[in-house]
A protein has these predicted regions:
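Conserved signature/switch motifs of ABC ATPase nucleotide-binding domains
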Residues: 92, 156, 174, 454, ...
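Conserved ABC transporter NBD signature motif
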Residues: 66-78, 370-378, 390
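Conserved ABC ATPase "signature" region
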Residues: 130-149, 429-447, 556-557
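A short, proline-enriched helix->beta-strand linker immediately N-terminal to the Walker B motif
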Residues: 173-177, 471-475, 491
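Conserved ABC ATPase signature
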Residues: 153-158, 162, 452-456, 460
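ABC ATPase "signature
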Residues: 239-240, 248, 534-538, 546
Length: 563
């Protein structure tokens, strides 16, 4: 094997087995990763990118998966032939991995510092005091604030970004030659995501280790990787240095991944999807400034559908067991109006108060003070019966549709259940007919009616969540991080669907997200929140083009732009 190649994968094929059927997941892929290089594997869910990384780590699920052919050379070892005992010395020591969800990788009952100490105890001969000093140094290296406090904290006591930094500290503790980062920023705010990418770059430059970075977002990896491999249905369809892949993509799938993220410079009527590119049917119609101005003249000549007036939400928290309650304002004096047929974007980092405000509008969590008017009536003072009637009019699409769907109900019954509660349709037969029509409108086949939530992909489940929401014929829909857990390509499909449904049914959206690029694409008005207050409020394009506040500038700067 050539010296400069740290990792060389040759004609690797992997199959999974179930109920006597072999399913080929990885189909003869080959690539090399050099020393001191960052290579990204990009593709949507199910493309095989994570399975490839698990094979390199020797972590393929036993009994149901098998490497059917090929080799994985790491330095002078073919990892396909290495036994489990030898792999224990390589894994964590020479090859380390950061996972997508740090909460499921960290032990919830063990302090963060102790978890990193465990790695060092397993792979080094340092004394206990030396190990503690090393962990504090690692926490400083990954730029954790107050390293000693984090050392003593449990995972649930720190933020998502801090948990991911603890995971990175664990991964680099033994100074590995290769770091595999599997979607390490997917669940994080754009600003935290940028910080984590900058941190990985800094560590790589300092330690000269190689990084295999796995993501579904091509724009994101362009800011980090030297080389890109594009995976589609278990095959590498394109590979090369990052700038050539970006500036001159050859495969339609690569072109689709680049185009699926909303552009900062213009607004397409429809976001291009992978199926559009694969069938060469990309709609490049742009919504002009004039179209937008004319739409807004009509929109804002109406009476507002919703008025939020000086709303506050205060929580009481204790700083210690015997201490007094300390008030914390999650929403602090917020006022704005929403007009029929409008999409207002609510954007800000985690903890800024945007979801709390959404819940207050939905009356799921009552505001401490202030007025919320829907069609001119204050909904904060409604009785139980009136509130129930309001629920039909104001609905929500959740971030995680799987958590909001009953796993024991078929999709059809899950959608029909709230229809029955709110007297939509006169009979079961009428309701079923309507549900089948709605499933068709959200791009699902009629057979979905009889299937269960676990049988669907993330994007399909989000479509089911949308179907359940629109079945009640609401007027105002709160979309709370409705696309943040989806692949960029699937996200484009769902955003197109939301816009199509809006033009068909005249819905009004409050679109909550931490991703300013997505919100800017969807929104007429943009409301930027920070620490419970409104930072900026105005036309989405105007705020994006010339933000006034530093906080807004920071959010815009953090959006992956691509090359």
């Amino acid at each position: 094997m050539p010296n400069q190649d740290l990792l060389k994968v040759n004609a690797l094929s992997i199959s999974f087995f179930g109920e006597g059927i072999e399913k080929k997941i990885i189909k003869s892929i080959s690539f090399a990763l050099r020393q001191n290089e960052i290579t990204a594997i990009v593709g949507e869910s199910g493309s095989g990118k994570s399975v490839s990384s698990l094979a390199i780590m020797g972590l393929l699920p036993k009994g149901i998966s098998k490497i059917t052919s090929g080799s994985i050379w790491f330095e002078d070892n073919d990892l396909v032939k290495v036994d489990n005992n030898a792999f224990q010395k390589i894994r964590g020591n020479e090859i380390a991995m950061i996972f997508q969800e740090p909460m499921s990788s960290l032990n919830p009952s063990m302090r963060c510092g102790k978890q990193v100490e465990e790695i060092l105890k397993q792979h080094t001969k340092l004394s206990n005091s030396e190990i503690k000093t090393e962990v504090i140094d690692l926490f400083e290296k990954v730029k954790l604030p107050k390293p000693l406090r984090i050392f003593k904290s449990y995972p649930h006591e720190i933020s998502g970004g801090q948990k991911q930094r603890v995971m990175i500290a664990m991964a680099i503790a033994c100074k590995p030659k290769l770091l595999i980062a599997d979607e390490p920023t997917t669940a994080l705010d754009v600003t935290v995501q940028k910080d984590i990418l900058d941190l990985l770059k800094d560590i790589q430059e300092e330690t000269k280790m190689s990084i295999l970075f796995i993501s579904h977002d091509l724009s994101l990896v362009s800011e980090l990787a030297d080389k890109v491999l594009v995976m589609y249905k278990g095959e590498i369809v394109e590979q090369g240095d990052t700038s050539s892949i970006f500036k001159n993509p050859k495969h339609n799938y690569t072109k689709a991944l680049i185009a699926a993220r909303p552009s900062a410079d213009f607004r397409l009527k429809q976001l291009p999807t992978i199926s559009d590119f694969m069938s060469n049917e990309v709609d490049k119609t742009i919504i002009s400034k004039e179209d937008r101005l004319n739409r807004h003249k009509t929109l804002y000549a109406q009476e507002p559908l919703l008025e939020v007036i000086d709303v506050e939400k205060t929580y009481l928290s204790k700083s210690g067991l015997f201490s007094k309650d300390v008030p914390f304002k999650a929403v602090d004096g917020v006022s704005f109006k929403v007009y029929p047929g409008e999409t207002i974007g609510l954007v800000g980092e985690s903890g800024c108060g945007k979801s709390t405000l959404g819940n207050a509008i939905l009356q799921l969590d009552k505001a401490t003070s202030g007025i919320i008017k829907y069609k001119g009536n204050d909904i904060t003072v409604l009785e139980k019966k009136e509130l129930r009637e309001l629920r039909k009019d104001i609905q929500i699409i959740f971030q995680d549709p799987f958590a909001s769907l009953n796993p024991r109900l078929t999709v059809g019954n899950a959608i029909m259940e709230p229809m029955k509660v709110h007297n939509v349709g006169n009979s079961s037969a009428e309701r079923k007919e309507k549900v089948l029509d709605i499933l068709n409108k959200v791009g699902l086949e009629g057979s979905a009616f009889y299937r269960y939530p676990h049988e669907f992909s993330g994007g399909q489940r989000q479509r089911i969540g949308i179907a359940r929401t629109i079945a009640l014929e609401p007027q105002l829909i709160v979309c709370d991080e409705s696309v943040s857990a989806l692949d960029i390509s699937v996200q484009a499909q769902v955003l197109n669907l939301l816009n199509d449904l809006k033009s068909q049914f005249g819905f009004t959206y409050i679109f909550i997200s931490h991703d300013l690029a997505v919100v800017k694409y969807m929104a007429d008005q943009l409301l930027v929140m920070n620490k419970g207050k409104i930072e900026e409020l105005g036309d989405a394009d105007d705020i994006y083009a010339s933000p006034e506040k530093e906080y807004t500038k920071k959010l815009i700067h953090a959006i992956p732009k691509g090359l």
